[in-house]
């Protein structure tokens, strides 16, 4: 840029920042802390042009405890536009007076009258093009509304007591089209409490019902072109809404009517339909704290496996597919984290521009970052109107997209290699309101300089590389104690599922338990998160302890071979398949494992184990339960001794000989008795004669 032109731009910017005002009024309002909010609800035209009349409508709400009288709304706009993004950012950083000149011509402002505490009034201002007094140069004009009023002391300041700002582009035809798109995040706003139920069931139901935040956001998103939208889905939201419908994890005493369940079902069906329309990006279940996982590599693998299982199970249940994506917190990105998240290289990571200090809009919103493990895509979020006064609305979103696109296409005129675009991601907590249709968001994608583009199509194109540094993370991740408790859930759950033949439902439920305590949300209440994780770990261990094994206190064999009983008890609610393995204190003796057997829920089974001591006299055995994959699980039985009597054979021989002697004696005695009887019968009788 030439020096004279630079001086002109600086002078114009200074003029904007100076803000022309009406002289002769006090510099500051008597009320030092006016508390009013302003929302722009409609703005036409969406693109400025000669001959058009700028019409802006919206609402102003008084949050003060006193009334404001003689309230008026004025349109404000500067004489010259911004032509680069850096000009916009500099102006915003320098304060909120950058909007421009207040239009005070008769008939261009709105008299609202008095505004009582907590009262909301609508405003409408109309200013013909000629009365805007603008230069007509191409660029982006900040345009807004300023609210003036008289306080309870009767004093009226020339300073606005409230304001709202958006942007209005003026771009002629013939410019290059740039990619324009919106990312719509749908996150689970609720969490499970200490007892396993959702802590705010009524709040979740309100969000997904008609007029609720998530319902309004979905309706707005569904109204946009498939080519210009990308759904960012948290599977925990799908599961949570489905739980509402089925009455699962609902606190005792909370009863949902059939109509309420129908509202939740409609939301779930509509969200799935929207996500399937253009393909979606899918977060890990409950948006996990990936920084905490990366900082604890010894725990990362089992925890990540559980999160993946919970995610996959939800996607399978709801027949949804999408590209895996990670979303760290705003200031929770490091180069090592990106390395760990790289995976196969096709899973994007969402980061803010603050995480990439050397990033510039000319690189585009989707860039390639090279890690030691290979390249990966990053989606960089950078909101044009961050920090401007006023509440977010559909109109400000529309104007943000149009203005980003206008600045991008103007940049390409002087920088043909620029990849600047107009991709934006809305705040997942934003409520566009039930009157979202009045904002006409679709107009953002009808401009001659915008090209509706999905993020999936962006990833199929060559990406520019970001070779700069990654900022240091300042966010505090979840504690190691919380991760260790989650790892104990994994360990106990893995052991339990290994003995359940049909364990998919059990595995999925345990995976959800793990994922539910690893979300970024727990950073705000780490103590509660850790306590819940420990409780879930204890419950998983308690369930495993319901499967027990009992052995006799001691066993004495009459020979080197014999058997002894082992009893397995299953007090869980699931049928199990489990075997038995033995540890012997005598290294020369090995007891064969008992093959797995099926035991029904609430049943017990006693089996006989055969043993051959061979030449050994005794051994101490410890019985362990064994899963079908050969791993020992649960607590072993108490150790017991098995002995073999060395005189066993002698005893049997002696007993045999004794029996023979007894038998011989009986035979001999019987024979003698028979002979005496025979002799007596053969002797002649004595003759008396």
Predicted regions, residues:
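Secretory targeting and sorting signals
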Residues: 2-29, 657-668
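Asparagine-centered strand-capping/turn motif at beta-strand->loop junctions
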Residues: 59-67, 567-572
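Short aromatic-acidic-glycine turn motif
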Residues: 76-100, 153, 584-594, 629-632
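Intrinsically disordered, low-complexity Pro/Gly/Ser/Thr-rich segments with frequent PxxP/GP/PP motifs
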Residues: 94-134, 590-616
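Short glycine/proline/serine/threonine-rich loop/turn segments at secondary-structure transition edges
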Residues: 131-143, 615-622
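Catalytic grooves of carbohydrate-active enzymes
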Residues: 221-225, 229, 309, 313-321, ...
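Membrane-proximal extracellular "stem/stalk" segments
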Residues: 513-516, 523-648
